[in-house]
């Protein structure tokens, strides 16, 4: 079944993309191994990781760390991987096992949020969804208007990674009436996030040339940096409407990581 009709299978292919992850905890010989969907959150696996590797430590005192950088459990996994590992999508390489550490102790409250329960995650996620809806339409009415059954279906589809329950509601709330496209642009792990919106109808190159002319002096050629979404280098000629339809993350934003050419 193809819920996108003639739109092709790009959204489903991206939905099925995974990252191989190994999570270790100092002093424990066990390791947590999983293929984690790019279109998911570490919040979804953190409780299982904590129960396996550090059962005596409260969940709220645990966090994940990569090379000394605390991982934001409320950011999409694929975004974190692209931003922090900086693996060039266009460079041939062997499959990567992303090695992450589970940490506990003095919580880095200035860098990440504490996760108390899954309800913490749910609240944060729907706030992000309302935020992207507001950028699209000038209000969050699309999310607020969802029935309880639709809201629960959408949430459970994310938790269960069920594309066929997720996509019809996503089409309804994210793509059917958009006036603008919500974007977040990442210049590096330590750089401020550029949160902005783009009008419908323009190309990615045209938008980036206007928004970041020093980095994109050309509308159609990579000269300094290149945009990466879901681990894929995106051509500057790509139409933003199509990127929004096919490459949008589940929180309603187009998250674009800029990598050096």
Swiss-Prot record:
InterPro entries: Atg5 (IPR007239), ATG5_HBR (IPR048940), Atg5_HR (IPR042526), ATG5_UblA (IPR048939), Atg5_UblA_dom_sf (IPR042527), ATG5_UblB (IPR048318). Keywords: Autophagy, Cytoplasm, Isopeptide bond, Meiosis, Membrane, Nucleus, Protein transport, Transport, Ubl conjugation. One of its GO terms (cellular component) is phagophore. Disruption phenotype: Impairs atg8-processing. It is a peripheral membrane protein. Signal peptide: none annotated. It is found in: Cytoplasm; Nucleus; Preautophagosomal structure membrane. Conjugated to atg12; which is essential for autophagy. It holds the Pfam family ATG5_UblB. The keyword Nucleus applies. GO terms for biological process: aggrephagy; autophagosome assembly; cellular response to nitrogen starvation; macroautophagy; meiotic cell cycle; mitophagy; piecemeal microautophagy of the nucleus; protein transport. It comes from the Eukaryota. There is a cross-link at residue 148 (Glycyl lysine isopeptide (Lys-Gly) (interchain with G-Cter in ATG12)). Transmembrane segments: none annotated. Involved in cytoplasm to vacuole transport (Cvt) and autophagic vesicle formation. Autophagy is essential for maintenance of amino acid levels and protein synthesis under nitrogen starvation. Required for selective autophagic degradation of the nucleus (nucleophagy). Also required for mitophagy, which eliminates defective or superfluous mitochondria in order to fulfill cellular energy requirements and prevent excess ROS production. Conjugated with atg12. Interacts with atg16 and atg18. Belongs to the ATG5 family. This is Autophagy protein 5. The gene is atg5.
